[in-house]
Amino acid sequence: GNAYMRIYSTKTTRITANATVNAADTHVRRSANYKPSSWSFDHIQSLSSKYTGDDYVARANTLKDAVKTMIRKSGNSLRTLELVDELQRLGISYLFEEEISNLLETIYYNYYKFPENWNKINLNLKALGFRLLRQHGYHVPQEIFLNFKDKNQNLNSYLLNDVVEMLNLYEASYHSFEDESILDDARDITTKYLKESLEKIDGSIFSSVTHALEQPLHWRVPRVEAKWFIELYEKKNGMSPTLVELAKLDFDMVQAIHLEDLKHASRWWRDTSWDTKLTFARDLIVENFLWTIGFSYLPNFSRGRRTITKVAVMITTLDDVYDVFGTLGELEQFTDVINRWDIKAIEQLPDYMKICFLGLYKSINDITHETLANKGFLILPYLKKAWADLCKAYLVEAQWYHRGHIPTLNEYLDNACVSISGPVALMHVHFLTSVSSIEEIHQCIQRTENIVHYVSLIFRLADDLGTSLGEMERGDTLKSIQLHMHETGATEPEARSYIKLLINKTWKKLNKERATVNSESSQEFIDYATNLVRMAQFMYGEGDEDFGLDVIKSHVLSLLFTPIQGI
């Protein structure tokens, strides 16, 4: 089923295939034994931040002006790339989008567009520029790195003393497309070099290398990275006190907006009454909200965070209906009602399914109404289809389970890319961008079909990889790891390696697609979609037993409840 909240609890196995519900409902339904929420409604509503006053806004504006002056003074030199990188990693580049856009355009035409200019750039800035320019949609070919190896295919000896250079080349290599062998070699060589260098380095460079080897920057969640990088950058030689102060202040001011979004979502959750009327429903409003910060932490995405939290909660609840509580007969009826989207059809459903359908029906209609009021177009047909597709995919998994069918890995993944819930979540995201015409959004939906598929595939594989073997043994459906073992006779470590390889290959396809679908109206959506992948890889780890509730709780406290500058 769905991945959003799998890691917070372990489900019991599904009810048996021959379980039926008669008029007296003699079948005893299993509870999934979920833990109660760590945060009560009253606690969430009591949260507040002092970083909302006019004084903070005024100070932030003064600091922004100072940074704009820094950017102007840096000119169009290649060194300016380091400033752009710092602004991005500190989480404040969104405040200087126009300045950064102009800078990168000038630097691209001066140094990167024409091969005859490449020899003016040292490897460090080649790698940094390559990463930033590809990230921003510029075409920079892999051949820019042709001479980083000697004729024996080893690293050129003059590179062997510069860890920062190797680190930048390592990070650049994760922006590769399929069949870019120069970048593949760069990744292999730099990974080996950086691992070996750990014994010889210390301080902030040691922290940076360890961090990068755990996960490359391109795969990291921007908000989580900002929290980490602010603390690292503050201790760095030559750091800018202006950047540090602005990054901290902005982090705390934006966190205050997130708190209001969370409180809004929490009130909505209470109003659904699902936590009291649906005994199996999980109260995971805070954890679900954390996902939305992964989509976008920016202040102007408030409506998006509030909407996506509702979507994630509804996905989690439907997942429990299909995975834990419903009999196969009930699930087939329920899927039919969702497909018809007809309130009159709910008479045939058991009471808990009526409550579930009515909650979904009302919430989707409310979202539709809000979009109609704000943007002037009707999105219900798009949303109805996305939710029906999700429920059909859930039903397929339930049918496989009840019939004892073991799908092939490809058969599983075709369905699991839908049941992971990426397509339904991203369909909602299409209508939360700043694009204001339904024609443009329709074009964007068509243009980004491959992106949605690749994002959903990595989302699914990351979820499966994050399922430890113990959890799989307790769980109710086969995952891609087990299916690969079943098909090929591979061991569990071999199967995990294969899934990681698939994730790597799919990232390359996603990178290519991001570069190809380079229209302004799609860019915002593409960034949100890529952030969903990053959030999935962040939330699921790689099957570590300890990656559970306590880890997530610490992230919630760090990102949502604790200001950097203190309370």
From Swiss-Prot:
Binds 3 Mg(2+) ions per subunit. The keyword Plastid applies. Pathway: Secondary metabolite biosynthesis; terpenoid biosynthesis. Residues 1-24 form a transit peptide. It catalyses: (2E)-geranyl diphosphate + H2O = (R)-linalool + diphosphate. (2E)-geranyl diphosphate binds at R282, D319, D323, R460, D463. It comes from the Eukaryota. Mg(2+) 2 binds at D319, D323. Induction: By wounding. GO terms for cellular component: chloroplast. Its EC number is 4.2.3.26. It is found in: Plastid, Chloroplast. A motif (DDXXD motif) lies at residues 319-323. Mg(2+) 1 binds at D319, D323. The Asp-Asp-Xaa-Xaa-Asp/Glu (DDXXD/E) motif is important for the catalytic activity, presumably through binding to Mg(2+). Belongs to the terpene synthase family. Tpsb subfamily. Monoterpene synthase that catalyzes the formation of (3R)-linalool from geranyl diphosphate, but not from isopentenyl diphosphate, dimethylallyl diphosphate, chrysanthemyl diphosphate, farnesyl diphosphate, (+)-copalyl diphosphate or geranylgeranyl diphosphate. This is R-linalool synthase QH1, chloroplastic. It comes from Artemisia annua.
